[in-house]
């Protein structure tokens, strides 16, 4: 790989800004926080150079265009699918062509589920085709389907109160949308709770903050000792319509057909690339997003955007001829949508070196206009991150909020490694999440430029500071 020896922006020699004196004695920092603040402030011109390149310079729109090429070419990338395998191989080649270092694939085993053909039709009180999306890991119905009367409930509590009515029926959940973290339990646990009271299947109102007759899929979980029943999500509109019908005392009958099957686990890979550290190469700042998606839409928002701004962060740093003291590592996870399967296998493989991880970063809540970071770590680490984020004042992206957790980095965070997630405008995120609407049309190249600049500045500065982030 070639690195630029000199890079000038506004007459400033970037590499001179990266030099730092040794501040360790017997492994203990002797610096005051004011000295740390001064060190971070010295990266101001580096941050401006990254911002200029990403937002206004030759690299603007690059992450968007790279992403569009992949998702238009490959499409959705379900765990275990040929599409995911193809995307991984394409990204492996892309990272090599980008002249990043130590590009490699780390193998693992991941779930392989396919939805097959599926349909739902209301037979009573009138004929009405119901849009559905089967949920990940659901079983299928018999070939002839399941035809049964419907019981509509709005909560698990109501289901328990009406348990005697549920046997032999299809339970329809019309739970209100509060927020994703509180409402998603109906998607993940709806089938189990319905099966406990003798239901034949469950249909769940999509976990969406807005709907234009769009079902949203996602993972669901069975429980040992509880019968497994078919389960799918339906649109907000159909859930509300059936709730209104039921409140009038009208009998509702649905025929449900699902061809879903689970196959043996299959081979897959986490995709890795680096810029090797100049002084502490064994120490790591990790940036990441997941390459897999659900099998609807294009997986552009979830999580193509996060994966591609993570790649872009390394590209920007490489293009400026910068080499941080620590290794900056990109990981594109496999099988996140099945519960962080690829990330867990990565953690199991690398946790022996956990003391060398300074910061783990994940972007998996969209790449809309960012306002800052969500961060989990010690108070001292948070104070450092607040100073780092002040470098992004030119973009007005300076917030540091709590809860930096993400599915793929939680393993590290729970073990004490500081973690960060991109904080961006989520207003429209759950309009499109896990639906046919997750396409490149959702993405905004200018917003991706800003997100990539944030990702690059934060990862570079933390990787280049003389000290790792302090832990509790």
UniProtKB/Swiss-Prot annotation:
EC number, UniProt record: 3.4.17.-
Highest rank taxon of the organism: Eukaryota
Molecular function per GO: carboxypeptidase activity; metal ion binding; metallodipeptidase activity; protein homodimerization activity
A Pfam family reported for this protein in Swiss-Prot or TrEMBL: Peptidase_M28
Protein residues bound to Zn(2+) 1: 290, 302, 364
GO CC entries: cytoplasm; endoplasmic reticulum; extracellular space; Golgi apparatus; lysosome
Leader sequence segment: 1-20
InterPro entries: CPQ, Peptidase_M28
GO BP terms in the entry: peptide catabolic process; proteolysis; thyroid hormone generation; tissue regeneration
UniProt keyword list: Carboxypeptidase, Endoplasmic reticulum, Glycoprotein, Golgi apparatus, Hydrolase, Lysosome, Metal-binding, Metalloprotease, Protease, Secreted, Signal, Zinc, Zymogen
Subcellular location: Endoplasmic reticulum; Golgi apparatus; Lysosome; Secreted
Modification after translation: N-glycosylated. The secreted form is modified by hybrid or complex type oligosaccharide chains.
Propeptide cleavage-removed residue intervals: 21-44
Active-site residues, record numbering mapped to chain: 336
Primary localization class, coarse: endoplasmic reticulum
Glycosylation sites: 61, 179, 353, 356, 396
Residues that coordinate or bind Zn(2+) 2: 302, 337, 434
Xref: PANTHER family: CARBOXYPEPTIDASE Q, PROTEASE FAMILY M28 PLASMA GLUTAMATE CARBOXYPEPTIDASE-RELATED
Entry similarity comment: Belongs to the peptidase M28 family.
UniProt subunit comment: Homodimer. The monomeric form is inactive while the homodimer is active.
Function description: Carboxypeptidase that may play an important role in the hydrolysis of circulating peptides. Catalyzes the hydrolysis of dipeptides with unsubstituted terminals into amino acids. May play a role in the liberation of thyroxine hormone from its thyroglobulin (Tg) precursor.
Designated name of the protein: Carboxypeptidase Q
Organism: Pongo abelii
